[in-house]
């Protein structure tokens, strides 16, 4: 008999970089910069670069922690809203090159990207479009500066898996001493279509977060919570209704999967007063199930402390989290069960019930066209107590399952 064809795709479907990104599931965010030393979340842009002076910065310590916790990559705030650059940009003096750290010769973006390669983690970059330090922000001259810095980061630090544009845009700031409020139209000012072309050309494997040409979407909150059900589709690029971000749209025409960004502490940057305010183990476990367990990726933030290291309490908590999850998924009971189904596509082995429990992301059980209700049965040699069920859909063909 002839080869049984796979089910037809249900469009939209993910492109290659979106699919690779969704398979990562969890990765770390690092907020670090002048705000760390100012005890602030959003710097005004007027703090001297000399304020940045970590005494014991160790990117290997960060990455070892993330890898041990099961994270697949790291995102770094290369420049936050205050405009201070963690690399020695050729286009501004407001960077690490004018700090005492490493004698003005340091490059934190380089150190972290190199550490990621040494330890086998992917590396991504956050670049704030808003710059409260730059005197030309709000004018065309700043747009050229923004794109020049973007090209520096895209070409100087190896392969990137994600490029992050923050949604905070315009407001009061230092702006080179003007000390005023400036407003822009975020949809048109930055030239995001040009940015997309540049990123796709120089970093073809990187998904884009934010802006007007994104590959992935914000989940609509900073709590680490996706909706039930969370569709990977939206209409167009989505609108401003938070429900569209949190749940997606079942009849969407654009594949735009969700990312849950949340911090292990109350703030994104390090604050000594929050040393005893870490999220509890139970809350972190809930976050995992409410993000990854609801068809979203988890971007978990770690506010590196003033010394340049992940605080010991943060490291201990995330390792508790890892051990707890490993224990919950330690024994795959379905792997020892006999799987049968009342319908298998064309009777073909490649779509058999066994493919649903083989632990592979590239195989799946499928039914004949027109079958909208089918039964998958698992038989054990003896009674088994089940505490978790992990169900996944073969998304290269689109998203069909509305609820479980």
Regions inferred by a protein language model and the residue ranges of each:
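Mature catalytic domains of secreted/periplasmic carbohydrate-active enzymes
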Residues: 1-358, 363-370, 390-392, 399
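Hydrophobic residues in beta-strands and at strand termini
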Residues: 341, 378-382
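Extended extracellular/luminal ectodomain segments enriched in beta-structured repeat modules
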Residues: 371-373, 381-390
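Well-ordered beta-strand positions in beta-sheet-rich domains
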Residues: 375-377, 403
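Short coil-to-beta strand junction motifs in C2/discoidin
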Residues: 397-404
């Amino acid at each position: 008999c002839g080869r049984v064809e796979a089910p037809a795709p249900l469009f939209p479907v993910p492109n290659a970089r979106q699919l690779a990104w969704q398979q990562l599931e969890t990765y770390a965010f690092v907020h670090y910069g002048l705000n760390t030393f100012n005890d602030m979340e959003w710097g005004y842009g007027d703090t001297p670069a000399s304020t940045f002076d970590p005494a014991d910065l160790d990117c290997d310590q960060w990455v070892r922690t993330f890898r041990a916790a099961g994270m697949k990559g790291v995102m770094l705030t290369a420049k936050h809203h205050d405009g201070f650059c963690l690399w020695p940009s050729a286009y501004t003096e407001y960077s690490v090159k004018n700090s005492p750290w490493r004698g003005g010769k340091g490059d934190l973006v380089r150190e972290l990207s190199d550490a990621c390669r040494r330890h086998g983690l992917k590396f991504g970059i956050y670049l704030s479009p808003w710059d409260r330090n730059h005197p030309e922000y709000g004018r065309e001259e700043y747009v050229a500066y923004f794109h020049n810095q973007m090209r520096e980061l895209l070409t100087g630090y190896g392969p990137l898996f994600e490029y992050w544009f923050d949604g905070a845009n315009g407001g009061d700031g230092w702006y080179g001493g003007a000390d005023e409020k400036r407003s822009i139209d975020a949809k048109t000012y930055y030239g995001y279509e040009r940015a997309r072309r540049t990123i796709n050309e120089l970093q073809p494997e990187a998904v884009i977060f934010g802006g007007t040409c994104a590959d992935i979407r914000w989940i609509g909150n900073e709590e680490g919570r996706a909706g039930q059900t969370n569709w990977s589709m939206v209409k167009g690029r989505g609108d401003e209704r938070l429900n569209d971000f949190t749940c997606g749209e079942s009849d969407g025409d654009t594949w735009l999967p969700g990312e849950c960004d949340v911090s292990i502490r109350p703030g994104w940057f390090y604050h000594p007063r929050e040393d005893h305010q870490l999220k509890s183990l139970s809350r972190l476990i809930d976050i995992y199930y409410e993000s990854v367990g609801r068809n979203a990726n988890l971007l978990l933030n770690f506010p590196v402390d003033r010394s340049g290291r992940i605080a010991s309490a943060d490291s201990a908590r995330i390792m508790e989290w890892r051990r707890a999850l490993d224990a919950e998924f330690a024994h795959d009971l379905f792997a020892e069960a006999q799987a049968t189904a009342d319908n298998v596509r064309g009777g073909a082995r490649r779509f058999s019930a066994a493919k649903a429990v083989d632990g592979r992301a590239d195989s799946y059980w499928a039914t004949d066209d027109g079958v909208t209700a089918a039964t998958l049965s698992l038989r054990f040699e003896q009674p088994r107590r089940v505490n978790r069920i992990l169900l996944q859909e073969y998304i290269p063909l689109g998203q069909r399952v509305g609820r479980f």
